[in-house]
Amino acid sequence: MLTFLIPTAKEMMIPKESHPHLLPQDSQAILKIMAAMTTEDLAKSYRIKEEAAKKEQQRWQDMASQQNLAYPAYQLFNGLMYRHIKRDKLTTQEQAYLTQQVYITSSFYGIIPANHPIAEHRHDFHTRIKIEGQSLKSYWRPCYNQFAKEHPQVISLLSSEFDDVFSKDCKQLWISPKFMAEKEGQFKTHSTISKKARGAFLTACMENNCQTVDSLKSLVFAGFYYHPDLSTDHEFVYIKKEA
């Protein structure tokens, strides 16, 4: 069985479905630090303006006082990749695939199933804090490595910020899809192409119930197709021709 890892997103949209917010033990140490930070501290940590930091401060304080709700993560996150993932009117098989084989890597919650209930928050591995004297990446590394040991065959749709959260020896069987546009024989990639394609790729995997590495090579989605000459055992390259 294939396991997919996808990143979080800064952009969020409140869905209809909500739950009480139950925070994992490992996250509580982070919450304690974030909730104690001033608006000025948060602005520096996030590298945002103080006006925007006020909103984030309120979210953390609401979370600390247990006054907020939680929502299925794949529905709450609404960044470009998430908007290109099929999230509504799923078949029973697609729903099972999404909730049992897709996991979200978070610097606040750890690695969680795609439908795990989470609260509105802003947090990533660039957030400048120390937990028990450790960086966020060092703090989460044992948890992330344990997940990797339990799920050796991972399809990683993660961005570069996660490269050194996992130890290298845990990623020997990982495959990272790469998405490129071809125009007049020139190949290019950028974040917009990649984010849209990640969502479309995951949707195609769900719809086709891909369970083997070889099945990924036959996928055609949003104009992309597998390119064997550019691919390696650990990097599957998908090309889309542009007019």
Curated annotation (Swiss-Prot):
NCBIfam families, A to Z: PRK02101.1-4 (NF002543)
Entry's HAMAP family? UPF0246 (MF_00652)
Q: Which organism is it from?
A: Streptococcus pyogenes serotype M28 (strain MGAS6180)
Where is it found, in Gene Ontology cellular component terms? cytosol
Q: Which family does it belong to?
A: Belongs to the UPF0246 family.
Looking up PANTHER family in the UniProt record yields: PEROXIDE STRESS RESISTANCE PROTEIN YAAA, PEROXIDE STRESS RESPONSE PROTEIN YAAA
Which BP terms from GO are recorded? response to hydroperoxide
Q: What is this protein called?
A: UPF0246 protein M28_Spy1772
Signal sequence annotation: none
